[in-house]
Amino acid sequence: MIQISDLLLIANVSPEVAGSSGFNMIASFFAAALLIVIPAATFLIFVSQNDSLDRTSATRRR
């Protein structure tokens, strides 16, 4: 079985570049979570809670 380090040497990629690339990929995942996923989830939870309250109060009025 070929080791990852052998693949990096065959591809002529230095370990520093590979490490930097991996770090930047993980950092971009965290940035996406902070900028997109967390605000979207917060908004959806807020809207669903308000909709639930509106439906509950509308049912009581009938």
UniProtKB/Swiss-Prot annotation:
Compartments it resides in: Cellular thylakoid membrane
Superkingdom of source: Bacteria
Keyword Transmembrane carried by entry: yes
Segments passing through the bilayer: 26-46
Keywords: Membrane, Photosynthesis, Photosystem II, Thylakoid, Transmembrane, Transmembrane helix
InterPro entries: PSII_PsbX (IPR009518), PSII_PsbX_type_2_subfam (IPR023428)
Key word Protease present: no
GO annotations of cellular component type: photosystem II; plasma membrane-derived thylakoid membrane
Pfam families named in the record: PsbX
Membrane-protein topology: Single-pass membrane protein
A GO biological process held by the record: photosynthesis
Family to which the UniProt record says this protein belongs: Belongs to the PsbX family. Type 2 subfamily.
Chain's role: Involved in the binding and/or turnover of quinones at the Q(B) site of Photosystem II.
Assembly description: PSII consists of a core antenna complex that captures photons, and an electron transfer chain that converts photonic excitation into a charge separation. PSII forms dimeric complexes.
HAMAP family documented for this protein: PSII_PsbX_2 (MF_01388)
Protein name per its UniProtKB record: Photosystem II reaction center X protein
Natural source organism: Prochlorococcus marinus (strain MIT 9515)
Gene giving rise to this polypeptide: psbX
